């Protein structure tokens, strides 16, 4: 069973303040609809050649697509140096002749370097933007004017999970990647401890969903994380063993916790539009 605490320690408040000061003000109003550009990328794939994509999900991106939405690559403003990895967006294009009103849900799993295009979309996502029979016309356009907003991720029956990265080496060198982070929140801090111990040790963010520690405790491990967004935050952890003592690189472990929170925002009223 997952345990959620809303009591914020003084150390967490310092972390939150530091995070807020380094985050662009606009990110606090993520429920607002924004205008941008999206382009078609025939090469965008759940299994990008030569690696795991700009977020490093690799083959797990295919699972995220099946459970969360179509795959998308985000530009610098969306990717945010990896902090945007795994975020979910609702998007529709603005050409009334060929674009559907409902649009599509996408999951950010890759990065592209252009500042002129906010998103690159693969074939399925691009086709989903179009009215029936109009996808071929959309693909002929260089870039589409789109409306988009961040929305809560919903991975259906998936709990927050941990992928032990291949570069990990037992017992002390541990690198993990979070998968299936639901809701509309960000992970700000991660601690690890041996099951039954109160000796929590902090992990360091490598980028986006990847965290590491070179002095991981021995034995079966438990985790806790500060999940925050806007001005709201809480500790989240599973009150059970997450990684066994003989954890293996390349394996995925279920934390048993599920995040469904939508962090409150301090921004002023903004356009939300009707997305029916």
From Swiss-Prot:
Sugar attachment sites: 115, 159
Gene3D superfamilies: Expansin, cellulose-binding-like domain, RlpA-like domain
Domain Expansin-like EG45 residue range list: 52-158
Keyword Cell membrane: no
Keywords for this protein: Glycoprotein, Secreted, Signal
Main location: secreted
Keyword Glycoprotein listed: yes
GO cellular component: a single term: extracellular region
Family, similarity comment: Belongs to the expansin family. Expansin-like A subfamily.
Protein name: Expansin-like A3
Species of origin: Oryza sativa subsp. japonica (Rice)
């Amino acid at each position: 069973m997952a345990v959620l605490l809303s009591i914020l320690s003084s150390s967490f408040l310092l972390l939150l303040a530091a995070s807020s000061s380094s985050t662009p003000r606009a990110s606090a109003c993520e429920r607002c609809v924004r205008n941008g550009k999206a382009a078609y990328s025939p090469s965008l794939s759940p299994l990008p050649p030569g690696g795991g994509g700009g977020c490093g999900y690799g083959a797990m991106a295919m699972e995220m697509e099946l459970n969360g939405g179509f795959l998308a690559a985000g530009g610098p403003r969306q990717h945010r140096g990896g902090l945007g990895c795994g975020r979910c967006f609702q998007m529709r294009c603005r050409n009334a002749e060929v674009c559907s009103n409902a649009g599509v849900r996408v999951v950010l799993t890759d990065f592209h370097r252009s500042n002129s295009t906010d998103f690159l979309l693969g074939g399925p996502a691009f086709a989903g933007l179009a009215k029936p029979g109009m996808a071929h016309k959309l693909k002929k356009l260089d870039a589409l004017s789109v409306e988009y907003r961040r929305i809560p991720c919903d991975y259906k029956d998936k709990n927050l999970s941990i992928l032990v990265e291949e570069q990990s080496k037992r017992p002390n060198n541990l690198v993990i990647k979070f998968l299936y982070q639901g809701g509309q929140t960000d992970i700000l801090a991660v601690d690890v401890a041996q099951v039954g111990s109160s000796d929590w040790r902090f992990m360091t963010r490598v980028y986006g969903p990847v965290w590491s520690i070179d002095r991981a405790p021995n034995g079966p491990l438990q985790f806790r994380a500060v999940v925050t967004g806007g001005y709201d935050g809480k500790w989240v952890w599973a009150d059970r063993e997450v990684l066994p003592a003989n954890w293996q690189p390349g394996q995925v472990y279920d934390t048993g916790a599920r995040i469904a929170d939508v962090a409150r925002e301090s921004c002023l009223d903004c356009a939300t539009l009707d997305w029916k």
